[in-house]
């Protein structure tokens, strides 16, 4: 499997780092990373890593200004792309087909080729413009996976919440996260079901 990972300047850089760390442990997945200029700034603000450290997690890292990179062409076959986190500027550009920079161009290629595009949009609160852009992209087949925490799995650390979001992103490609804690039903419902088998 070949996946493109785009990181933009929105907050939640730890999600992108954790995704790359998880994919690094999957020998059958080849990753192509592109970080926007502001993604690099956000990474260094929100994580203990440098942009160089994060780039090293991917099999290939591409210059965000390089519109001639291999991921900018549909003839380079991939299984899809994840933009994590996805800023509202990037999301709006993807919706409009405004391929400004390599993140936008790679997403545009994935869309035109009918491949899977997963966006992890990060903004709060959401304006009508944001919601309409997400709805339009959803109607095009783009998967919206906002980084919303779950509490049924009783997270004890920020990492637990991050792993849960990353696991839900990986689910979009049928990939299993080793730290995923999945819903098992309510305890009383499980007991009732077992008693009535």
Swiss-Prot record:
Its EC number is 2.5.1.129. Pfam families: Flavoprotein. It catalyses: dimethylallyl phosphate + FMNH2 = prenylated FMNH2 + phosphate. InterPro entries: Flavin_trans-like (IPR036551), Flavoprotein (IPR003382), UbiX-like (IPR004507), UbiX_pad_YclB (IPR032901). The keyword Thylakoid does not apply. Belongs to the UbiX/PAD1 family. YclB subfamily. Homododecamer. This is Probable UbiX-like flavin prenyltransferase. It comes from Escherichia coli O111:H-.
């Amino acid at each position: 499997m070949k996946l493109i990972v785009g990181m933009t300047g929105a907050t939640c850089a730890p999600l992108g780092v954790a995704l790359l760390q998880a994919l690094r442990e999957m020998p059958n997945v080849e990753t192509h990373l592109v970080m926007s200029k502001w993604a690099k700034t956000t990474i260094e603000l929100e994580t203990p890593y440098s942009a160089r450290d994060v780039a090293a997690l991917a099999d290939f890292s591409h210059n965000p200004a390089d519109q001639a990179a291999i991921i900018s062409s549909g003839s380079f076959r991939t299984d899809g792309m994840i933009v994590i986190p996805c800023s509202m500027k990037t999301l709006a550009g993807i919706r409009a087909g405004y391929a400004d920079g390599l993140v936008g161009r790679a997403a545009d290629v994935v869309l035109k080729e009918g491949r899977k595009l997963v966006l992890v949009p990060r903004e709060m609160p959401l304006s009508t413009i944001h919601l309409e852009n997400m709805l339009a992209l959803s109607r095009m087949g783009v998967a919206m996976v906002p980084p919303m925490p779950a509490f049924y799995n009783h997270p004890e650390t920020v990492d637990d919440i991050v792993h849960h979001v990353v696991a839900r992103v990986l689910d979009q490609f049928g990939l299993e996260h080793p730290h995923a804690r999945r819903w098992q039903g309510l305890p009383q419902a499980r007991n009732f079901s077992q008693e009535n088998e």
